[in-house]
Structure formats: C-alpha cells, structure tokens
C-alpha cells in the first residue's frame, strides 16, 4: 500500500522546461498504486476536468510562492497519493465504524473549508488568514486520525507536507493579495470549487 519505488526520479522537471499537468500526474500515480487492484475508478475525482483544473492552479500558485517547480510538483503529487490511498481504503471497506465517523467529520470540515475559500474570495474585505489556516489544519488532523492504523509515517509526512503548505498564513496572504497572477489562480480555484459544491462532490 505505501511503497514508492522510483521515488527519487519520478515526475522531476528538467531545468527550463515547464510541463505540468495534474491529470497526467494523477493517472501515473493511479496506474502505479492501483496496478494490482481490481478497480481503477478510485481516482476519478482527481482526473475529472474540474478537479484537474483546481490542482493545476494550486500548482501554479505554489510554484510562484515557493519559487520552485520541484517543490510545487511534489506538493501536488503528495495530494494525489494521499487521495488515492484513502480512496483505496474507503472502497475496500477498510475503515471501522468509528473511522467512518471520522470520514464524515473530515468531509464536513473540507466542505466548510471549501465554502470559506470561496466566500473570502467573493465577499470583499472578509479574508481572514487565521480562520482559513485553522480550518485546513483541522482537516489535516482529521486525516491523521483517519489513517493512523492504515498508512505509514511516510504518508503521515505527506499529509503534513500538503496541509502545512496550504495552511501557511503567508501563502494564504499572497494568494488573497493584490497580485494579478495570484488573483487569476484564486478565481479559477474558486470557480472549480463552486462546480464541485454544486455537484455535491465537496
């Protein structure tokens, strides 16, 4: 479940060459992780157009903030790996009744965080980086609780890597700041989130 052969070279970007596509990355990870699984449907959420667009914009914003294509790529790759592994556990009924309660709590918290992301963008002067950061960190803690008995410390490290980045108050300040590049990223992220909310996916 938690092995990652070829971790060092997978997905590295050559200097000066910008080539990033979250759908392609999700499909690569899906093929690798699920090569021995009966179903390939578990990653559908990550490979639909709307989710791919959101991940692409998160990559661009992360690349701009970190000034590192490699780091931004790793953040999104960790998002995909976490989602795939949790999806496998969920679809194979590996969670106990108590853990399923944690799943529901996580879904509600993610829904709250998603609506907050959009609200802070759509309603002027409402952005509060502390509130949004706290919501994302609560999502992180619920995920740790959920996979405690299922995944390795490496996966827990990925969860920290992803949520600590997106909950970074300095990153959130830049994302919601006046920069046109970040505003474009945020608008597309919120458009995608609104679609997922309307569809009941989030």
Swiss-Prot record:
One GO term describing the cellular component: plasma membrane
Keyword check for Cell membrane: yes
Principal localisation: cytoplasm
Annotated protein name in UniProt: Tumor necrosis factor alpha-induced protein 8-like protein 3
Keyword set, alphabetical order: Cell membrane, Cytoplasm, Lipid transport, Membrane, Transport
Gene3D superfamilies linked to this entry: Tumor necrosis factor alpha-induced protein 8-like
Pfam families in UniProt: DUF758
PANTHER family: TUMOR NECROSIS FACTOR ALPHA-INDUCED PROTEIN 8-LIKE PROTEIN 3, TUMOR NECROSIS FACTOR INDUCED PROTEIN
Function field: May act as a lipid transfer protein.
Gene name in the database record: tnfaip8l3
Protein family (similarity comment): Belongs to the TNFAIP8 family.
Feature: compositional bias, Acidic residues: 1-10
Subcellular location field: Cytoplasm; Cell membrane
Span list, region Disordered: 1-21
Protein origin, superkingdom: Eukaryota
Keyword Cytoplasm: yes
GO BP annotation list: lipid transport; regulation of apoptotic process
């Amino acid at each position: 479940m938690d092995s990652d052969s070829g971790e060092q070279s997978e997905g590295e970007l050559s200097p000066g060459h910008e080539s990033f596509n979250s759908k392609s990355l999700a499909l690569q990870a899906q093929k690798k992780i699920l090569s021995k699984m009966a179903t390939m449907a578990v990653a559908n959420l990550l490979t639909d157009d709307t989710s791919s667009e959101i991940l692409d914009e998160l990559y661009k914003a992360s690349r701009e903030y970190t000034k590192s294509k490699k780091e931004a790529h790793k953040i999104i790759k960790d998002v995909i790996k976490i989602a795939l592994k949790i999806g496998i556990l969920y679809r194979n009924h590996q969670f106990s009744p108590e853990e399923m309660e944690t799943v529901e709590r996580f879904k509600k918290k993610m829904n709250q965080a998603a609506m907050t992301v959009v609200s802070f963008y759509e309603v002027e002067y409402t952005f509060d980086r502390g509130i949004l950061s706290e919501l994302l960190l609560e999502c992180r803690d619920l995920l740790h609780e959920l996979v405690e008995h299922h995944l390795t410390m490496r996966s827990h490290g990925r969860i920290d890597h992803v949520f600590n980045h997106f909950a970074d108050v300095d990153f959130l300040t830049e994302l919601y700041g006046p920069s046109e590049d970040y505003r474009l990223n945020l608008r597309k992220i919120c458009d995608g989130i609104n679609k997922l909310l309307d569809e009941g996916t989030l």
